[in-house]
Amino acid sequence: MSREPTPPLPGDMSTSPVAESWCYTQVKVVKFSYMWTINNFSFCREEMGEVLKSSTFSSGPNDKMKWCLRVNPKGLDDESKDYLSLYLLLVSCPKSEVRAKFKFSLLNDKREETKAMESQRAYRFVQGKDWGFKKFIRRDFLLDEANGLLPDDKLTLFCEVSVVQDSVNVSGHTSTNTLKVPECRLAEDLGNLWENTRFTDCCFFVRGKEFKAHKSVLAARSPVFNAMFEHEMEECTKNRVEINDLDPEVFKEMMRFVYTGKAPNLDKMADNLLAAADKYALERLKVMCEEALCSNLSVENVADTLVLADLHSAEQLKAQAIDFINRCSVLRQLGCKDGKNWNNNQATDIMETSGWKSMIQSHPHLVAEAFRALASSQCPQFGIPRKRLKQS
């Protein structure tokens, strides 16, 4: 009997895709076997093409589908005259057709199966139709007593049949009563720990404003804080840290990031927060600030942003600022002022801004870098014009 299908188990759902509904198609297969013994086989005088048939058989007493075996002792035709041909014949069937696989074998003198041959697929049978093997076994091999295939001159054929019955569909819906794992609230929980100042063990004084914190959290998030609390520094022994180079609001936003990985007010203070992130080696926050500053680059602020990026080794921001300067310079030279990418403010020459003039005085190396980048980007486009060949 075939085993009935079952819906997917909850344990399987973590390793494979899960659909809202599912269906199993179970193809039922009925298997049965039949043994046919032919006594005094060597006396069979049937000529080539003549047939011996077994009695009919079925899968059970209530099965109306009847089968029989057909043997051509001296082959079916000239091609198989030196062979025994063996076929499975559908004698009667209540259906118009049926599909079945079959396997033939011989039983030797030790009652062991030998010389087995089987169909490679399920064949389509209709009433009166047979399938089998025209060259099942050579006659000379079969009749040779040394091979033990005709003990007491008896030929015993063994047949196994697998009949395909109707298919059955079993469908259903995936159970929604599986365990629902709550979302991770680590960031929210740590944020509440910071806001509520519970179990704090150190204190920061930022320009007169007090902030309480947890050494373990700070040390885990920042290598600078880790070094500060790990060594016998004054901040470690007194659990008190004085900070005079950061605005309290900037420090508060930085600490919110340390505890939660988020900085909701980043856009309002990206420049100052970049400096804080650089000072305390908060690399992710630093790149987040770079991204915010890149998205707000303008003719008026690009020089100041370039100085800021250079000061805090923000290489991605620095590259974007230089690229912005190059693009504005090229567009200005070409006179491209489309309303989409170029407005009246951008039309102002960057070199006329106070930020650029200040940068010339304080960071001349950045001016040189910007011009080098501009020259290298324009060389292919604005290279020395080639002399045109004179035409005769």
Swiss-Prot record:
The keyword Nucleus applies. Pfam families: BTB (PF00651), MATH_2 (PF22486). Pathway: Protein modification; protein ubiquitination. One of its GO terms (molecular function) is identical protein binding. It comes from Mus musculus. SUPFAM superfamilies: POZ domain (SSF54695), TRAF domain-like (SSF49599). GO terms for cellular component: Cul3-RING ubiquitin ligase complex; nucleus. Residues 200-267 form the BTB domain. The keyword Nucleus applies. This is Speckle-type POZ protein-like. Keywords: Nucleus, Ubl conjugation pathway. InterPro entries: BTB/POZ_dom (IPR000210), MATH/TRAF_dom (IPR002083), SKP1/BTB/POZ_sf (IPR011333), TRAF-like (IPR008974). Belongs to the Tdpoz family. PANTHER family: SPECKLE-TYPE POZ PROTEIN (PTHR24413). Component of a cullin-RING-based BCR (BTB-CUL3-RBX1) E3 ubiquitin-protein ligase complex that mediates the ubiquitination and subsequent proteasomal degradation of target proteins, but with relatively low efficiency. Cullin-RING-based BCR (BTB-CUL3-RBX1) E3 ubiquitin-protein ligase complexes containing homodimeric SPOPL or the heterodimer formed by SPOP and SPOPL are less efficient than ubiquitin ligase complexes containing only SPOP. May function to down-regulate the activity of cullin-RING-based BCR (BTB-CUL3-RBX1) E3 ubiquitin-protein ligase complexes that contain SPOP. SMART domains: BTB, MATH. Homodimer. Heterodimer with SPOP. Component of cullin-RING-based BCR (BTB-CUL3-RBX1) E3 ubiquitin-protein ligase complexes containing homodimeric SPOPL or the heterodimer formed by SPOP and SPOPL. Interacts with CUL3 and MACROH2A1. Residues 31-161 form the MATH domain. The gene is Spopl. GO terms for biological process: negative regulation of protein ubiquitination; proteasome-mediated ubiquitin-dependent protein catabolic process; protein ubiquitination. CDD domains: BACK_SPOPL (cd18519).
